[in-house]
Amino acid sequence: MVWSWVAMASRWGPLVGLAPRCLWLLGAVLLMDASARPANHSSTRERAANREENEILPPDHLNGVKLEMDGHLNRGFHQEVFLGKDLGGFEEDVEPRRSRRKLMVIFSKVDVNTDRKISAKEMQRWIMEKTAEHFQEAMEESKTHFRAVDPDGDGHVSWDEYKVKFLASKGHSEKEVADAIRLNEELKVDEETQEVLENLKDRWYQADSPPADLLLTEEEFLSFLHPEHSRGMLRFMVKEIVRDLGEAGSSLAGAPGPGDQRQGPGIAGKSGKVLREPQPGCGLIRSRLTDQDGDKQLSLPEFVSLPVGTVENQQGQDIDDNWVKDRKKEFEELIDSNHDGIVTAEELESYMDPMNEYNALNEAKQMIAVADENQNHHLEPEEVLKYSEFFTGSKLVDYARSVHEEF
């Protein structure tokens, strides 16, 4: 028996000694393969380019503003004006008790007179405070973005400086673009990029306060990125949203006001068709609202209209029905202030103004009405917790029991 084990050992011995050498060789081959394979930096470069583009492009979504740039209702509006800087802090995977406690802390801050009820006036004050937080956040971001497009640090950004940075974010060589602009040579860009550039330039003109010099200060650049910060740019934003895609001259904004008499490129859409789903960044190209009869005001059918023949199934029909229902409610209860069935430029501008105190009071009443189960025109802790999804975007379970826990 002993001799048999010795014989086996003598036969397997060379192979056992070979194992470490094989493993070493395999590791070396894998390392060489990894080294020879070209590193995939394209996704990294793409993410960096997208980040740069997003930083210098006016955003399609503005926190605390009722409409998106494409004319959609802002679905997150109520959470934005209720949570302010805490927006995004109530994800559903967060520990529920901690989220409920955080919500009750907010409740106590809104409830100024500590009667454990939130009145419309208290909610109005809170909405204005949270909107101011979004304004401050936008100002801080704009300062950072301004420095990115003001390479010489002279406190002014020219249209050409901005154009170079924008095209560089789209993948063009910054040096080649700068040289072409300096030599007044034609730039070769695709049709969509050209259309975005034309819209941006028109917006640049509008943000350039008189006397017009095509140079934006830091304050003007803020208005360029965030039109809600400027009365004139808010008016321009309304015009962009309701402009008829097929008719560049059909807009709800009416005649240009002082300082708007500048000649900029036209911004006509390629067709009058209203598209169902905009592509990313298309707030600068397409509009969702259309003044279909060109009378420079919006009727209810115009505000709720959707393209005919685009519903493919029952789910799509349900989406359309919800679209019409939501927009009809918004039109009748909030936008059409004199209830004559017509929305004028002034009414829409007032509705879009995030710092309008009258609007904030109306919104406060609307928000209370959603959760006011006992119909006392106030919000109580149980109601806020039960309707937590409306206020925070997250559904917090066991709301009734948690009231006693948190208080």
Swiss-Prot record:
Ligand binding (Ca(2+) 2): 150, 152, 154, 156, 161
Sites bearing Phosphoserine, chain numbering: 99
Biological process per Gene Ontology, one example term: calcium-ion regulated exocytosis
Region: Disordered, residue numbers: 249-282
An annotated GO cellular component: Golgi lumen
Domain EF-hand stretches: 98-133, 137-172, 291-313, 323-358, 359-394
Record SUPFAM superfamilies: EF-hand
Subcellular location(s) per record: Golgi apparatus lumen
Source domain of life: Eukaryota
Keywords: Calcium, Glycoprotein, Golgi apparatus, Metal-binding, Phosphoprotein, Repeat, Signal
Glycosylation sites: 40
Region annotated Necessary for intracellular retention in Golgi apparatus lumen, chain positions: 354-407
Residues binding Ca(2+) 1: 111, 113, 115, 117, 122
Positions annotated to bind Ca(2+) 3: 291, 293, 295, 297, 302
Chief location category: Golgi
GO molecular function: calcium ion binding
Keyword Thylakoid: no
Signal peptide: 1-35
Comment, domains: Binds calcium via its EF-hands.
Role this protein plays: May regulate calcium-dependent activities in the endoplasmic reticulum lumen or post-ER compartment.
Name this polypeptide is given: 45 kDa calcium-binding protein
Source organism of this protein record: Macaca fascicularis
Lineage, opening ranks: Eukaryota, Metazoa, Chordata, Craniata, Vertebrata
Name of the gene: SDF4
